[in-house]
Regions:
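Conserved donor NDP-sugar-binding/catalytic core segment of glycosyltransferases
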Residues: 6-41
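Alpha-helical elements of Rossmann-like donor-binding domains used by nucleotide-donor carbohydrate transfer enzymes
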Residues: 11, 15-18, 85-89, 131-135, ...
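Short, flexible, basic/aromatic active-site loop/helix in glycosyltransferases
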Residues: 31-61, 68
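Short glycine/proline- and charge-enriched loop/turn segments
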Residues: 43-50, 71, 111-120
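A short, conserved alpha-helix in the catalytic core of glycosyltransferases
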Residues: 59-62, 66-71, 75-106
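Active-site donor/metal-binding and catalytic loop motifs
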Residues: 100-120, 133
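Non-catalytic, C-terminal membrane-associated alpha-helical segments of glycosyltransferases
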Residues: 124-132, 143-198
Length: 198
């Protein structure tokens, strides 16, 4: 799986096939990116393959036979947490996840959409981040646990929405309004329905 803003280095595929000879029962082997903001791994560390709890989803090599029992991505997620959820289900079934620093990609990050539609995408991003955050915690730890996790974010978003509304910062007030709406929809068990308006 590769995001549209990711390019594989020339030796990435060869290094991947070398990696699978070193590990057993893997579900995911992920590469690293030199883009520090979107990297899977601290590149200052050694080059050995390492077992981890989860990886970022910009590029992943999947061992498909290990997904027959647990399923693939949860389609209830539209943006965010889908790879964390996938990794959680793998780990719950004792299937290993690795990062291999010898497999390198170029990941621009944040460029998968046109700059002209930044505001609608930013509003959508915030809506879905909050929706997915509650849904993930509810799914794996229960409704009340998810509620306790998301409540501070809800209160913070409401306060910031009011502050930015008072000082006439429409963009910021809209961002926090959409955060609140994302949380409310998720807590009310509504689907991840919101789509950006252009």
């Amino acid at each position: 799986i590769i995001n549209p803003d990711v390019t594989l280095k020339e030796d990435a595929i060869d290094n991947f096939f070398f990696s699978i000879k070193k590990v057993e029962n893997f579900g995911i082997i992920a590469p690293v990116s030199k883009n520090e903001k979107y990297s899977n791994f601290n590149l200052d560390l050694d080059k050995d393959i390492k077992e981890v709890q989860n990886v970022k989803g910009f590029a992943m090599f999947l061992n498909m036979k290990n997904f027959k029992e647990i399923g693939f991505f949860d389609e209830n997620f539209f943006f965010y947490f889908e790879e964390i959820d996938l990794c959680k289900r793998l780990k719950n079934n004792n299937i290993k996840i690795y990062i291999d620093p010898s497999i390198e990609v170029s990941h621009l990050g944040g460029t998968s959409h046109n700059e002209e539609i930044n505001k609608p995408m930013e509003l959508s991003r915030n809506w879905h981040w909050m929706w997915s955050s509650f849904y993930y915690h509810k799914k794996h730890f229960g409704y009340m646990s998810g509620l306790m996790k998301i409540l501070p974010k809800l209160l913070s978003s409401i306060i910031k929405f009011i502050i930015y509304l008072i000082i006439f910062n429409k963009f910021k007030s809209d961002v926090y309004k959409y955060r609140v709406l994302g949380i409310i929809n998720s807590v009310l068990l509504k689907k991840s329905w919101y789509r950006p308006k252009f």
